[in-house]
Regions:
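Active-site-proximal loop/helix segment associated with metal-binding centers of metalloenzymes
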Residues: 1-58
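Noncatalytic linker/hinge segments flanking ATPase motor cores
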Residues: 18-19, 73-78, 116-122
């Protein structure tokens, strides 16, 4: 089933099948930055969303899982759920970013090591 057409400002959050194919055709990648998380055998609990949004999100997660399977990233970073967490599935590190203006909403990625460090927004030295 193809994702339904989304209209309005949320449309930019929903990748299309052609977006996924373009990512897959680019070949392997170490990092996947995306809005939602791919379906990799886990669900975030306690975060209710409207049923229509859940259906669209489930379609997007399945589409992203196809991309992950094809490009084999070592790290996936996303922010859709506004819930900070880290997990690992099938050898892939997954980092969810928190809500805007919270301590875990911004992270630094070391491209050499693929280590992710939360950016401390309360540190005046980092507010430049």
């Amino acid at each position: 089933m193809a994702p339904r057409e989304i209209q309005g400002p949320r449309a930019q959050e929903v990748p299309t099948t052609s977006d996924a194919e373009r990512a897959i055709n680019q070949g392997p990648a170490d990092v996947l930055l995306c809005h939602d998380h791919p379906s990799l055998g886990y669900r975030l609990k306690g975060l209710p969303i409207p049923e229509a949004d859940e259906r669209t999100s489930a379609q997007v997660r399945r589409l992203l899982a196809r991309v992950v399977e094809a490009i084999c990233p070592k790290l996936v970073v996303h922010g859709h759920w506004h819930h900070a967490y880290e997990t690992e599935r099938n050898g892939i590190s997954i980092k969810g970013l928190d809500c805007d203006n919270t301590d875990r909403t911004v992270a630094l990625l070391d491209l050499d090591t693929l280590e992710v460090e939360d950016w401390d927004l309360s540190d005046p030295a980092r507010r430049r």
